[in-house]
Amino acid sequence: MTFKLEELPSELLWLILEYIPPMDLFRTFFNLNQRFNKILRLLHYRFNLSCINRNQFNYFLNTILPSIEHNWIESLYIDDISDRIYSISTFKSLQSLTIHHLRTENIVSLANDILVELKKLNSLRLYSEFELQERDINSLMIVIFSQRMPSLEYCYLGFQDHGYVGFDGLDSINQTLSLKKLIIDRWCRIRDFIRLLHFIPNITHLTIRLFDLNVKGPFVQSLNTINDFTTLVPNLIYLRAKLAEIPFEIATKILFLRLPSNLRELSLSTWSIGYGNGDSWKSLLSSKFPYLKHFRLIISLDRIPQNYLVASIADLDNIAKSFNQSKYFLDHHWNVLINVNDHDRLKFVLHTVQYPIENFQTTLYDTRHCTMSLSMMKSAYHHVSKLSLTLFDERISSSANLTENRYFPNLNQLTFLSNIRNEYPEYSPDEYFNDLKSMINLSTITCINFAEENHHYPNKLVNLLLKSLPKLHTLIIPYRLYTCLETQSICNLKILTLIFAAYSSISPPATRMRDILTRHQILTNDLILELLQTLFSSFPDIQTLTLTVRGLDGFDSQFSEWLKANLSMERNIAYDLLLPDKILQFYF
């Protein structure tokens, strides 16, 4: 039975069309007839403008926006490139806003000119991989943690590790009353964390990274002014924290014992084996948190702890027994799994099951585990969306050493680290790839990252992988490896990052540089022009090309002038030069 879509009642059409991505919706139905135009004008829209090129963005600005009611735009995802974020101020009724690639020079304007005008904004997510100035972040904090954003209930701040965040500029009188869920993915000192609690009185869910190098002696006394955080955040029921340089005994005194007793979930990650005593946790949790439903713990170490035996499964079971043989933990179904691998950069990982956060690092082979049921092992990593795998030299038989029963079904980002020391190791890419497919669902991956410019990756393995990633739109790769790619397998790529060891304004580079590096490790002006001329033939949907230098030399003082002279707007390519990050970005 067939029918024409336009024969459906308007109410049903309305519901159907709202499920179609807006860009596709307009290209299909706009100006088809007056009825469709009227429906398109009054739909509720959720625009995802991430990973679109300039022509697509211009279509959004010049065709879609004039044809719809701006008050019906509920949600917006956008990249901070080519001043695109300034279009946000048009959408006064926006309820949800996500910005990727936020740059420090736009933060103050975003905070003071854009966010304060979005009085209905309920959800805000900001992401940046760049170096952000502390004064700019402070300007943002002053707006977010105040009544200038009266409807904001959810806020995610995901910034790069170039420093820590403080809250010295916040106004105690003008504190936010609406904020319920807050995630700050940046390091924060304990004393700044306590200060933050004064400005978020209605918070229920809080995620933070905490550190302090001076938590002993007189400093601890300075933190003792408030004995119970319940007076500051009485509704807090969820805390997730990454802890660094804070011993378990100190964290218990200045953090855990001060938390509200009605906490429902406590999720912690640390690099200290001092947090690995189940008896200590039982004593704390059972006495302090009677309503706790979920306890999550991750301990990640780059070396095996001293005096710990890890040669056999029995050794690992012995380490985990204070958790896995405790009646308290068994009654709550809080099991602990231990992974040990001498080849990995993280050699010892203890975590509760299921693994509680989105990031996980491991190897494909030779990982030893404590005893765990097959079904529990199979489902342990359901929440992992970002996986890092370490490659190493030795060729290991998969039948004997494959990390059986672990499975990662929901990845969107896969990063390869390399401990391969030889350019041509004794290695079987085909065997590795086949084993990889049994552990990872490749069909969901959108981003793949070969992050280390000065390390070796097997070319054949890289090409096998790229052929098997149907949703891939982002690739981060050293240029010397990029030159070996079979690019026809990734023709739908939208974001490409090429990594170099050095930049040279001279082509060919100086002899000194060529003696140290290969020509494919050096970014030159001629190579930049060549990439811009040839990129579209390989990737017709490309939106962003990023060139980053991670080694000997960055961009010199004359480079900015060269860009202006050689990349006029006639090329229809915009660009940004981020000197502190040694990054050059082109937008198509």
Label each residue range with its predicted role.
Residues M1-F588:
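Eukaryote-biased activation of long, low-complexity terminal tails and linkers
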